[in-house]
Amino acid sequence: MLKTVHQKAGRHTRPVRAWLKLLWQRIDEDNMTTLAGNLAYVSLLSLVPLIAVVFALFAAFPMFSDVSIQLRHFIFANFMPATGDVIQRYIEQFVANSNKMTAVGACGLIVTALLLMYAIDSALNTIWRSKRTRPKVYSFAVYWMILTLGPLLAGVSLAISSYLLSLRWASDLNTVIDNVLHILPLLLSWISFWLLYSIVPTTRVPNRDALVGAFVAALLFEAGKKGFALYITMFPSYQLIYGVLAVIPILFVWVYWTWCIVLLGAEITVTLGEYRKLKQAAEQEEADQP
């Protein structure tokens, strides 16, 4: 495959161009945009149950009561640009209604949230082309760990942010703390994507490749937030067409765009390792020729 890629790129093609061709080939073969659409659909169905489960976990720990409020504002300000306030109001109403549900309904919420985890697992292993399967109990443990530890780690990071803000009275630390707080969303995105690419696939993922793919995804995610917010602000066509319902297509487009970025980071991670292996195989083949 690599030999064909090099031939198409030209005899003296640089490795970066050959890798980009391989990346594009994999994106096309994996139908990445279709996978992103499927995940966006499942995410919208699972959004309220997932948030309900997350904040129910915070409610179980009184020490995180203040952090829970900060986490809500942080999520909607940094992960849902432009329309975060409107979406936050609607979702908080839905979550408040879900608190009135019975035990059977609560179990249904948890199952729906876990279905999103399963969809993510399936999509990433499709990209990694891994046919290995985990035991059901182990898969459930991984999904539950993501549901529980993810929000708690986010709560701890916000507690650290609050502590850093409390130190801003010291003029010497002002600039340093501002810089740390400015890059915190990027850092959290990078760590989250790295954990996703490292833990979810059922095959071994080189740590360096996962870090590179996660960093590219984090950069695109941060740039996407700013670009999407700018588009919504400068070209408010959705508001003109849909009126008060504009939040629905805006949310769907943003969720779809987010999953495109997540899956692109996964494709980059996979392609780095695959290109390295194919290059070694091609070099070995040339060395074996008389």
Curated annotation (Swiss-Prot):
InterPro entries: UPF0761_bac, Virul_fac_BrkB. Signal peptide: none annotated. Residues 1-43, 125-139, 201-209, 265-290 are cytoplasmic. It is found in: Cell inner membrane. The chain crosses the membrane at residues 44-64, 104-124, 140-160, 180-200, 210-230, 244-264. GO terms for cellular component: plasma membrane. Residues 65-103, 161-179, 231-243 are periplasmic. Its main location: membrane. Pfam families: Virul_fac_BrkB. Keywords: Cell inner membrane, Cell membrane, Membrane, Transmembrane, Transmembrane helix. It is a multi-pass membrane protein. PANTHER family: INNER MEMBRANE PROTEIN YHJD (PTHR30213), UPF0761 MEMBRANE PROTEIN YIHY (PTHR30213:SF0). Belongs to the UPF0761 family. This is UPF0761 membrane protein YihY. It comes from Salmonella typhimurium (strain LT2 / SGSC1412 / ATCC 700720). The gene is yihY.
